[in-house]
Amino acid sequence: MQLNLAGRHALVCGASEGIGRAAAEALAGLGADVTVLARREGVLVEVAAALPRVHGSQRHGHVAADSRDGDGLRAAVSALVAQRPVQILVNNTAGPPGGTAHEAQPERYVEVFRQHLVANQILVQAVLPGMKAAGWGRIVNVISTSVKEPIPNLGVSNTVRGAVASWAKTLASELGPFGITVNNVLPGYTRTRRLEQILAERSAATGKPAEDIAKGMLATVPAGRFAEPAEVAAAIAFLASPAAAYVNGINLPVDGGRTRSL
């Protein structure tokens, strides 16, 4: 199986921790040059320095930018690609706090839509010229299993994640002729700060201990455990590899079998 990414440049968003950091490590382990993007520059410097180097010519770096600041994000990534075109883009943004859909303020929907779909669009438009010039590109969006089955009390997240999935499916058709694939990875319950946030929110809302909430969640997972970030990253790395050249426009759950829909 051809997994070698030597000579490819990957931009991984939300890479300071969790799934994003694990994805950066996985892609670097396959030989890619990796640029990590997130808000906290000090952390990014450490992450980039710790990434694997499997051959001598690998160059890793970082870009400090905030998905909530569209103009700043565009400027930062445009400066990056002017120096080093990107062939692999991993869109990965932390989810919003929980709450019901009907109680969320309209402004909240707009804010999260900008942070997720609009930021993704800015990134795609910045990297597309380099991908088209190479005749090769991979766009992988880290979303959620809520794309297939809405998750209770994550109303805004469910709505915006679904929009991102539809956007990605449209892009897959538009960009396929250029040798560019667009796919979505749908993580299930994964050991990240996001999971800790969800447990804390549900505990506060119900009065139940977070440990009991976690047990209830695990009861819905046939694998009987939470995922590790590296397991989600493995799916991302595969979709970014040459081996996945004919995989385009899919939603890939990485959830231990929890999602019941086909």
Task: Please report, for each region that a protein language model flagged, where it lies by residue.
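C-terminal substrate-recognition "lid" of short-chain dehydrogenase/reductases
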Residues: 4, 136, 223-254, 259
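Conserved glycine-rich cofactor-binding loop
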Residues: 9, 16-17
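Rossmann-fold cofactor-recognition segment
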Residues: 53-70
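Substrate-binding pocket helix/loop in short-chain dehydrogenase/reductase
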Residues: 100-113, 139, 217
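Alpha-helical segment proximal to the catalytic Tyr-Lys
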Residues: 129, 173-174, 245
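Catalytic loop of short-chain dehydrogenase/reductase
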Residues: 140-164, 168-177, 189-190
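Short, small/polar-rich loop/turn modules that mediate ligand/substrate recognition or access, typified
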Residues: 176, 181, 247-249
